[in-house]
A protein has these predicted regions:
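N-terminal, active-site-proximal structural segment of metallo-dependent hydrolase catalytic domains
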Residues: 1-57, 72-75, 205, 307-311
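Active-site beta-strand/loop signature of hydrolases that rely on acidic residues for catalysis
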Residues: 5-10, 30-50, 113, 142-164, ...
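Active-site environment of divalent metal-dependent phosphoester hydrolases
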Residues: 15-16, 46-50, 124, 161-162, ...
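Structured beta-strand-rich core segments of catalytic domains in phosphoester-bond hydrolases
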Residues: 44-123
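Conserved beta strand-loop-helix elements of the APE1-like EEP
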Residues: 73-89, 260-279, 305-306
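Short hydrophobic/aromatic beta-strand or adjacent loop that forms the aromatic wall/cage
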Residues: 76-78, 99-104, 266-268, 296-302
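Surface polyanion/phosphate-binding segment centered on an Asp-His-Pro turn
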Residues: 284-311
Length: 311
């Protein structure tokens, strides 16, 4: 049987599952109809008990839940909803063990799935330093996991647009976290330059270099590591690989008419190993039909993977 994986930043699970009116029924109603077998959730912003309470109707219908809350209450938090029990569950990465930003487990079929919530950052603040530190810790783990788990998908809110095509108004966002040169260079190092032959020119002269709170000296530990596009990547942006020029946006600010005007950002990704990319059949975003029907500022990103022959 095929395996469908969804990834979505729920923007607070208690708010996402709230029924607002007879038309806006929230995430629980979406779970009743989704084709997903696994839902990778980010920004859960709840304790384990609160998350189980919010999702109780879905759990009663057979969904199983694992969560990794952030130590700081009301912040971050990741979770995995699955129709099958997970084994070999792991939370956190070095330096961010209790930050509620990474959770992985293996399905009975052998596919390993992970939910990632990368720090959002904020240019010229300590939050951007935190984001760069996370990237530095995360990058070597990607190489380890690709070798250890040939069939693995890391879905989540990466909080970075890789290419100009990944946001509506790229020219006005060149100095904002989520589209800074070091962030985009990180994505190049993970996914390569596809579909371009070479990486896009990301060293905008008005915004090149460091954008954290502290200007580090060359070679200092805090300086974002120089990165180049991977010639032979171990991870693949599934949506972009399946739709080289048309991968849709996944996030729209609540401000103004961004949703109605489709002024969005593509910051949610499913990163797959080569074996999983070979199984990927189709990818799509389930965008709400109207702004008042949204239960998060993100929309679910889904990918259907063909049967891999596991038990």
């Amino acid at each position: 049987m095929s395996l469908t994986i969804a990834s979505v930043n729920v923007n607070g699970i208690r708010a996402a599952t709230k029924v607002r009116n007879e038309d806006s029924l929230g995430m629980l109603e979406w779970l009743q109809h989704t084709s997903a077998d696994v839902v990778l959730m980010q920004e859960v912003r709840a304790t384990e008990e609160q998350a189980h309470a919010a999702l109780a109707p879905a759990l009663d219908e057979g969904w199983q839940l694992v969560v990794a809350p952030a130590e700081a209450k009301g912040r971050a938090g990741v979770g995995i909803l699955s129709k099958h029990s997970l084994i070999d569950v792991h939370t956190g990465i070095p330096g961010f063990e209790t930050a509620g930003r990474f959770l992985a487990g293996t399905l009975p079929c052998g596919t390993r799935v992970a939910s990632l919530y990368l720090p959002s950052g904020a240019a010229e603040t300590a939050k951007q330093d935190e984001k760069y530190e996370f990237l530095d810790q995360f990058e070597p783990l990607l190489a380890e996991w690709a070798a250890q788990y040939p069939q693995m998908v890391i879905g989540g809110d990466w909080n970075i647009c890789h290419r100009r095509e990944d946001l509506k108004n790229w020219k006005t966002n060149r100095k904002k976290s989520g589209f800074l040169p070091p962030e985009r260079a990180f994505m190049d190092s993970v996914f390569g330059a596809f579909p371009d032959d070479e990486a896009q020119d990301i060293e905008d002269k008005a915004n090149a270099g460091w954008a954290g709170a502290v200007e580090y000296g060359a070679g200092d530990a805090g300086d974002p590591a120089p990165r180049t596009a991977a010639a032979e990547p171990a991870w693949f942006d599934v949506a972009r690989r399946l739709s080289p020029e048309a991968a849709p946006y996944t996030w729209w600010t609540y401000r103004g008419q961004a949703f109605n005007n489709d002024a969005g950002w593509r910051i949610d990704y499913q990163a797959a190993t080569a074996d999983m990319l070979a199984r990927a059949q189709r990818s799509w975003v389930e965008k709400a039909g109207a702004v008042e029907l949204r239960w998060s500022d993100h929309s679910p990103l889904l990918v259907e993977y063909a049967d891999g022959g596991g038990a």
